[in-house]
Amino acid sequence: MSLQVALLLLLRCLASALAQYELCKSLVSTDEGSVWEHYACQPKATSMKDYMRIKVDPPGITCGNPPERFCTLENPYLCSDECDASNPDLAHPPQLMQDKERNGLITYWQTVTWRRHPEPLLANITLSWNKSLELTDDLHITFEYGRPTIMVLDKSMDHGRSWQPYQYYADDCLDAFNMQPKRVRDLSPTNITRVICTEQYSRWVGSKNEKNVKFEVRSRFAVFAGPRLQQMDNLYTRMESMKGLRDFFTFTNLRLRLLRPALGGTYVQRDNLLKYFYAISNIDVPARCKCNLHASQCLLVDGNLQCQCEHNTTGQDCQRCKKGFKAKSWKAGSYLPTPNGTPNTSNVCDEEMLLCQNGGTCFQNQKCICPPEFKGVLCQQSRCEAGKDCNSASSLDLSTALLLLCTLLTHLLATLSPH
């Protein structure tokens, strides 16, 4: 065993001990030598705000063209602030919802004021990734100058061709949507995917006291994994057994429908409509690429997120077999059995063009068992490099030592882990 392979083994062992479903494969020792063992795998969660494309409509809803003054609900008659699209210091374009704020300076997108009341002040914000994603934590929308009194969060799973409501928000759910108000904590394992209306994020408490509107993901996970999410195996088991649960957290696009702005805890005051508008400083979407449990990495390729597929799969979401592998054998990976899951790997020797080489034999129509002097998926590579001694016993000694060290590391990390 070369030092490079030894280090690879050690690193993969350490990574496997640290996290679930972050490895697609690792080298294991068998009677036939070291072979790849495949696992269900998924990319790490990250903030998707840097990758989202923002579209705001209707046209002209963003303030500043023409320039206009506005007030705040706390100081409704001090209308000294101005929005001017032609002045970078006074402009509030949509991209300020996803920029990195520096030196404590808050930047935000802002709409025109409600000067056309009683015509509704409506705005749609569509977030697109051109990629299937899965929510992994709470979605946060940060509003400046007050949260909307009525709003809807929609999602699409087909790149915006069709939409479905994700959650309703209102200061009075019964009046706005004819729905009884609920919180996520009111839900049970049997109705955790229910679309609810919540009043939790729409009541007036002052624009500076509470700015965030959330779509709660952690609380939904906690129904299965416990309040501290320490029983993730239970969640992953439910993801497999409960119809619609995985799809509930899956999306390609999100849309905010802003239906009525903050009113300051009272009715619309028609003598001063310059204090009514929407302003958003940040949208944070913690998620991971959906790769059907066939990839541990997701990279930006030509401007689009792309799963780096394993298990003989391909496609943006690893949604089909590689060329030369039977399409009918494709399946999404499974979280079960925990902790490594089932990769549902497409067979490596199910086509004539993929017959094992150099005297290798096909084992259970899944992998090639190679003669001692050859290696590789199809036994296509010689184990002995030119000019090197292939009969040294040091390889066996190093392999044994690594396996012992790997076992010790796994037990040590399991002892230290809160899970």
Where are these regions (language model features)?
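Aromatic, loop-rich ligand-recognition surfaces of beta-strand-rich domains
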Residues: 2-51, 60-65, 77, 101-172, ...
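Cleavable C-terminal sorting propeptides in eukaryotic secreted/cell-surface proteins
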Residues: 394-419
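C-terminal GPI-anchoring signal of eukaryotic secretory precursors
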Residues: 358, 383-403
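Beta-sandwich interaction modules
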Residues: 121-123, 128-130, 178-264, 270-271
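Disulfide-braced loops of extracellular cysteine-rich modules
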Residues: 289-292, 330, 349-358
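Flexible, disordered linker segments and immediate boundary regions flanking tandem C2H2 zinc-finger modules
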Residues: 177-180, 328-337, 387-392
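Non-cytosolic beta-sandwich-type ligand-binding/adhesion modules
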Residues: 39, 47-51, 55-57, 66-104, ...
